[in-house]
A protein has these predicted regions:
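N-terminal functional modules and adjacent low-complexity/disordered segments of proteins
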Residues: 1-3, 9, 35-37, 71, ...
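Non-catalytic, mostly N-terminal accessory regions of nucleic-acid modification and defense proteins
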Residues: 1-10, 15-20, 24-41, 106-115, ...
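Conserved S-adenosyl-L-methionine
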Residues: 30, 34-129, 134-136, 154, ...
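Aromatic-residue hotspot detector
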Residues: 55, 116, 149-150, 211-213
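Long, N-terminal intrinsically disordered regulatory "head" regions
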Residues: 63, 141-143
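Short beta-alpha connecting loops at secondary-structure transitions
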Residues: 79-82, 122, 144-149, 209
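Conserved catalytic motifs of ABC-family nucleotide-binding domains
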Residues: 133, 143-154
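Conserved Class I SAM-dependent methyltransferase catalytic core
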Residues: 153-212
């Protein structure tokens, strides 16, 4: 049962990455009047709340199929992927997960850090994330102190959305899993949503329906 669950989760994650890629490709081809576009191919990608590295591994599998060029494959394995998580055990599991797929053999691409209080100036061309939802009871003060540009809120999902908006490069692409509340809540969430719609090109919203078994 456990193996089946892991297999299902990985398949869903890979499917999500493909959906993100296809959505961006369709949008870009429309903008460029039908020209093809490789949107997640051999660029630096990150997951700021990577968990055990499912999105990163799925992104790797997707990019690996795009070219057999040795130098591109080497770049992909050693320089293309970055992840972070604030739980030490999870970081170890993510590093091991990628290592078993020959990724980051010399140096793990997974950092043990809280992305919401990280003040580094690293920017990324592609961001894939399924951040934790809910209220951040601990650490809200640190977020406010380290990220004064953020709209102040204790909602994890809204803070991660703000973080993602701050680290995506101009012309970059983002695929992020968020709860419906990000689309409907008022207050701080509405302020962040307004900034998203004003300063970024939001072109695809997919809503997953859940079956109750």
């Amino acid at each position: 049962m456990c193996a089946q669950k892991l297999s299902f989760d990985y398949a869903q994650t890979l499917h999500t990455v493909r959906i993100v890629h296809n959505a961006h490709s369709v949008h870009r081809s429309r903008v460029q009047k039908g020209k093809s576009c490789d949107c997640i191919n051999f660029v630096r990608a990150t997951d700021p709340a990577c968990g055990t590295g499912g999105f990163l591994l799925a992104a790797y599998e997707h990019m690996k199929r795009q070219s057999k060029d040795i130098e591109k494959q080497k770049f992909l394995k050693n320089h293309a992927l970055f992840g972070a998580d604030n739980t030490a055990l999870v970081v170890t599991l993510a590093s091991m997960n990628l290592y078993l797929h020959d990724i980051g053999v010399n140096k793990s691409p997974i950092a043990y850090q809280d992305s919401l209080i990280d003040t580094s100036d690293k920017m990324y061309k592609v961001i894939l994330a399924n951040p934790p939802f809910g209220i951040r009871h601990q650490g809200s003060v640190e977020v406010a102190a380290n990220r004064p540009e953020f709209v102040k809120t204790s909602d994890n999902q809204v803070n991660f959305l703000q973080h993602i908006m701050s680290i995506v490069k101009t012309g970059g692409r983002v695929g992020v899993v968020l709860p419906d509340s990000v689309l409907t809540d008022t207050g701080a969430t509405a302020q962040v949503r307004e900034k998203l719609l004003k300063d970024f090109n939001l072109h695809t919203i997919l809503r997953k329906t859940w079956r109750i078994l």
